[in-house]
């Protein structure tokens, strides 16, 4: 039986592997090279990658625009050049108190300007910022607007090694010095947790870097539903499971070190795969329209789109705010068949992608 190669695959990336390299297991399982993802994770990070195969790679812009949720372990008192455990220390500062840290958090909620890390995949004149830095260039990355919906402090470890979880915070000594903090962040597309941690620590009169990072959700996709989730370490069990450069092992034949990865079973990849349908779009809360079948040829032939072609236009427009209604990318189905994506706006919807099945 031929495998369906048009799938959505929630996939658990392991720390120490690039997002691109992580896709190799899926490419091998489906015998295809046409696999994309909806948002890169740093090398040291683990967690959810939403992979798209075949024609569904065209959904990347829609899914990547969804909110993201992360868990992070923050180490205070040191800042590295990369703001992660792969970098070299460039700054030290006193540890923040519990009071300073918790009072600093509200400053970062809502829409804020954030300067991305210099060591990042952001392109400057066609070349990654991180590559320019490593080649000795001095660069300056402009601030960009992001939105932080939630920052929760889940646990702390003090300078003396005492551990507290959120249930202990009611009666905690506000002057305790914090070495590590476990936080959960819900944020918009384009947010860098490394930058957030840098700025939060400085606001609390300290400095910090992200010791470990895990993405737990992309929109309604959840990490616990991903292929390979059971292979990830318990993120709450700090610090023994935190990402460390020392976890690299030597490949004597190649003469270099690498991060050992756990194999993901082919059957699990297939079991976790999702076929795209109106029900899938509904469950994932992705915007979608039903095209009246009598306009299918008009749609396929690229005629000017009219709102009366669709059966549920009013319902969709009611759920999109005025601010969002500027080329809001929306999936189009004819019955159960996905036939494309349009840019939805108040005046003239436009074609983004047409899938001729």
Curated annotation (Swiss-Prot):
Gene: truB
Protein name: tRNA pseudouridine synthase B
EC number per UniProt: 5.4.99.25
Gene3D superfamilies assigned to the protein according to its UniProt record, in alphabetical order: Pseudouridine synthase
Role played: Responsible for synthesis of pseudouridine from uracil-55 in the psi GC loop of transfer RNAs.
UniProt record similarity statement: Belongs to the pseudouridine synthase TruB family. Type 1 subfamily.
Residues in the signal sequence: none
Pfam family, one: TruB_N
UniProt record, GO biological process: mRNA pseudouridine synthesis; tRNA pseudouridine synthesis
Reaction catalysis annotation: uridine(55) in tRNA = pseudouridine(55) in tRNA
Residues the record marks as active site: 42 (nucleophile)
One Gene Ontology molecular-function label: tRNA pseudouridine(55) synthase activity
NCBIfam families: TruB
């Amino acid at each position: 039986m031929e495998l369906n190669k048009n799938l959505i695959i929630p996939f658990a990336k392991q720390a120490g592997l690039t997002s691109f390299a992580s896709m190799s297991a899926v490419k091998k399982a489906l015998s295809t090279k046409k696999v994309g993802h909806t948002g890169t994770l740093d090398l040291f990070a683990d967690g959810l990658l939403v992979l798209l195969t075949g024609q569904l790679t065209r959904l990347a812009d829609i899914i990547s625009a969804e909110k993201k949720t992360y868990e992070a372990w923050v180490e205070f008192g040191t800042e590295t050049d990369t703001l992660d455990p792969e970098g070299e220390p460039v700054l030290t500062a006193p540890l923040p108190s519990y009071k300073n840290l918790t009072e600093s958090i509200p400053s970062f909620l809502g829409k804020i300007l954030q300067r991305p890390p210099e060591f990042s995949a952001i392109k400057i004149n066609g070349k990654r910022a991180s590559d320019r830095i490593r080649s000795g260039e001095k660069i300056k990355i402009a601030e960009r607007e992001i939105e932080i919906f939630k920052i929760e402090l889940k646990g702390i470890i003090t300078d003396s090694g005492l551990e507290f979880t959120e249930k202990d915070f009611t009666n905690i000594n506000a002057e305790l010095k914090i070495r590590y903090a476990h936080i959960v962040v819900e944020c918009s597309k384009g947010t860098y947790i490394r930058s957030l941690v840098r700025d939060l620590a400085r606001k609390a009169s300290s400095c910090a870097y992200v010791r470990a990072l895990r993405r737990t959700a992309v929109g309604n996709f959840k990490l616990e539903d991903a292929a390979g989730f059971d292979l990830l370490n318990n993120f709450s069990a700090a610090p023994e499971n935190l990402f460390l450069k020392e976890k690299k092992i030597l490949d004597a034949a190649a003469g270099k070190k690498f991060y050992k990865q756990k194999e993901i079973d082919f059957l699990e990849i297939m079991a976790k795969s999702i076929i795209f349908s109106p029900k899938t779009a509904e469950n994932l809360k992705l915007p979608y329209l039903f095209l009246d079948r009598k306009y299918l040829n008009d749609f396929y032939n690229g005629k000017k789109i009219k709102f009366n072609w669709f059966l549920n236009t009013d319902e969709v427009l009611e759920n999109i705010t005025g601010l969002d209604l500027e080329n809001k990318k929306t999936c189009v189905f004819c019955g159960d068949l996905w036939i494309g994506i349009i840019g939805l706006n108040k005046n003239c919807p436009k074609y983004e992608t047409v899938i001729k099945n």
